[in-house]
From Swiss-Prot:
Transmembrane segments: none annotated. GO terms for cellular component: cytosol. InterPro entries: DUF520, UPF0234-like_C, UPF0234_N, YajQ-like_sf. Gene3D superfamilies: 3.30.70.860, YajQ-like, domain 2. The keyword Nucleotide-binding applies. GO terms for molecular function: nucleotide binding. The keyword RNA-binding does not apply. This is Nucleotide-binding protein Acid_3194. Keywords: Nucleotide-binding. Belongs to the YajQ family. Nucleotide-binding protein.
Length: 166
């Protein structure tokens, strides 16, 4: 019977994203090279999206760079962002939508479970909705599982939480 367990989650702290968006918008408004570019950053918390708008692609890339630097300073993982296409918009502007990924998708969770099973570690991994629970007999095995997963790239940001020992 496994006595120890931990959860693998992928979460983005929305208050930190909100603060980063506000800081980025303030910098965009103050930067000389973006003065008349009609650049805008809008956070839609209910949809987990950030909408970016600017006068052309070059200035949009500058806005993205500013936003990314503010997100990094606030410890928001950039792996949790999914960038949409750059779309021409009304008034000769361009838009881009960034989706904030919350939770682990089923395909990624299956990859994580498969990686743990292929490693021959004595742990049981189970998919629990939008997170993966890993259980094992001793803490050392769980630490090895965490090290193995940190060394692998699944294209998502993973946090290891809810570490339980008996």
């Amino acid at each position: 019977m496994p006595d120890n367990s931990f959860d693998i989650v992928s979460k983005i702290e929305m208050p930190e994203v909100h603060n980063a968006v506000q800081q980025a918008m303030k910098e965009v408004q103050q930067r000389f090279d973006l003065k008349d570019s009609h650049s805008n950053i809008e956070l839609k918390e209910k949809d987990n999206k950030i909408l970016l708008q600017s006068s052309d692609e070059y200035k949009l890339k500058n806005v993205i760079d500013i936003l990314q630097s503010k997100l990094v300073k606030r410890n928001v993982p950039l792996k949790g962002l999914a960038y949409g296409e750059i779309i021409p918009s009304a008034g000769s502007t361009v838009k881009q939508e960034i989706t904030l990924q919350q939770g682990i998708a089923i395909e990624k969770a299956r990859d994580i479970v498969k990686k743990l099973k292929d490693s021959k570690l004595k742990v049981q991994a189970s998919i629990q909705g939008d997170f993966v629970r890993v259980a094992g007999k001793d803490r050392d095995t769980l630490q090895s599982a965490i090290a193995l997963l940190r060394g692998s790239d699944f294209g998502i940001d993973m946090q290891f939480t809810n570490y339980r020992t008996n």
